[in-house]
């Protein structure tokens, strides 16, 4: 695998494809930069992480919010720190429920543009509510409000990731995965760094290479009307992001849903019919994987869906009993690493499904009612 991860040319001529393809290279660039910033990061973070009762909230809007859903569970268990994921869209509407003035707070704000109204307002509300509040924005846009406000603040460390991750396409692709990798490297450098993460970059590069010019589609083409992504733990966050990619790039022409395998039985399974594609992200953890495989086998026995596809790192009798994708060979991946692999398939599927349905992936909202940077938000001042 070439060390610079040179991406293949975009066969579709879209920014979205180009941005999907350059992800492995962007990750290593960003993590190499974080290696260089390690001393400065430690100077900022180490005193904070020693604070008793420190809360660490991962926040963002839309796709940027799902970063926290994917990585916060692992960061909390791995570091023993109080990580949680709360969208800016919840922080802004209900600050009194999430911002506790009695505990110090580190707010990690993710943003592609750094200009979403809720993201800017969440920082201001956190400062207003919590006397001892600190900020670590991770953003793709040097000119964005998140970054510019942070570099002029004495309670913040601004982390800028490579400019090419400021996706020009409508949907966030390289931006979400590079912000994910960067945050993991900041808080778990012994596990996620520019050297160890090459295994993830290599595997994802192999996935993209295996898909050729993307024209055959990831899951083939069929007249499905619905898609459901399922994943356990942090992989439910990856499932949520995968579903949003389909909704965004097809402009809602293909209905998309997400859940956990165990949660899916509790009502949502009702949506499965003979026009439904179900994709199960199979966990790499041997305990969790049992639950994923139980549901996979059940869905196939039900014989209600048009197709049920498993994506897994290794095969088994249950996986191999129906349509499946086995990840390219590599070392054992924990689920937070495996999420990057699953997103390669999901992003590519959404792109090609968009084109297949006659959409323009870079500007999928023909009506203009859904925007790349959200519009129409009125921020109401908090008055205690």
Model-derived features: positions:
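Short, charged, surface-exposed secondary-structure boundary motifs
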Residues: 94-96, 167-172, 265-266, 335-343
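An N-terminal domain-start capping segment
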Residues: 1-5, 138-140, 222-227
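Phosphate-moiety recognition in structured ligand-binding domains
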Residues: 1-17, 24-25, 29-30, 151-155, ...
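Catalytic-loop motifs flanking and including active-site residues across diverse enzymes
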Residues: 67, 71, 174-179, 238, ...
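Glycine-rich phosphate-binding loops that contact phosphosugars or nucleotide phosphates
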Residues: 49-202, 281-321, 325-330
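Active-site phosphate/pyrophosphate-binding segments
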Residues: 18-46, 51-53, 151-279, 357-384
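Alpha-helical transmembrane segments of integral membrane proteins
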Residues: 56-59, 231-234, 337, 341
């Amino acid at each position: 695998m070439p060390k610079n991860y040179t991406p293949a040319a975009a066969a579709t001529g879209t920014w979205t494809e180009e941005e999907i393809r350059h992800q492995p290279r962007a990750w290593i660039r960003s993590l190499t930069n974080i290696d260089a910033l390690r001393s400065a990061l430690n100077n900022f973070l180490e005193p904070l992480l020693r604070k008793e009762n420190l809360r660490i909230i991962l926040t963002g809007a839309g796709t940027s919010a799902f970063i926290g859903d994917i990585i916060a569970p692992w960061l909390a268990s791995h570091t023993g720190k109080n990580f949680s994921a709360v969208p800016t869209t919840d922080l802004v509407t209900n600050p009194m429920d999430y911002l506790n003035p009695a505990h110090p707070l580190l707010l990690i704000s993710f943003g592609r543009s750094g200009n979403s109204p809720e993201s800017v307002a969440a920082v201001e509300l956190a400062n207003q509510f919590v006397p001892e509040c600190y900020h670590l924005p991770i953003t793709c846009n040097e000119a964005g409000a998140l970054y510019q406000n942070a570099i002029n603040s004495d309670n913040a460390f601004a982390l800028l990731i490579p400019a090419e991750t400021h996706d020009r396409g409508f949907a966030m692709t390289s931006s979400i995965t590079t912000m994910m990798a960067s945050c993991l490297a900041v808080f778990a450098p012994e596990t996620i760094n520019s050297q160890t993460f090459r295994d993830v970059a290599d595997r994802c590069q192999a996935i993209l290479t295996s898909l050729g010019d993307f024209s055959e589609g990831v899951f083939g083409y069929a007249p499905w009307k619905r898609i459901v992504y399922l994943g356990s733990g942090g992989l439910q966050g990856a499932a949520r992001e995968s579903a949003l990619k389909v909704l965004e790039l097809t402009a809602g022409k293909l209905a998309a849903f997400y859940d956990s395998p165990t949660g899916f039985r509790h009502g949502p399974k009702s949506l499965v019919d003979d026009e439904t594609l179900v994709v199960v992200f199979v966990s790499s953890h041997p305990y969790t994987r049992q639950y994923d495989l139980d549901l996979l086998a059940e869905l196939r026995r039900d014989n209600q869906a048009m197709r049920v596809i498993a994506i897994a790192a290794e095969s088994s009798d249950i996986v191999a009993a129906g349509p499946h994708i086995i990840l390219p060979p590599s070392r054992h991946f924990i689920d937070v690493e495996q999420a990057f692999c699953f997103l390669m398939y999901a992003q590519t599927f959404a792109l090609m499904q968009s084109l297949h349905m006659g959409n323009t992936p870079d500007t999928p909202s023909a009506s203009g009612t859904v925007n790349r940077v959200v519009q129409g938000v009125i921020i109401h001042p908090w008055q205690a």
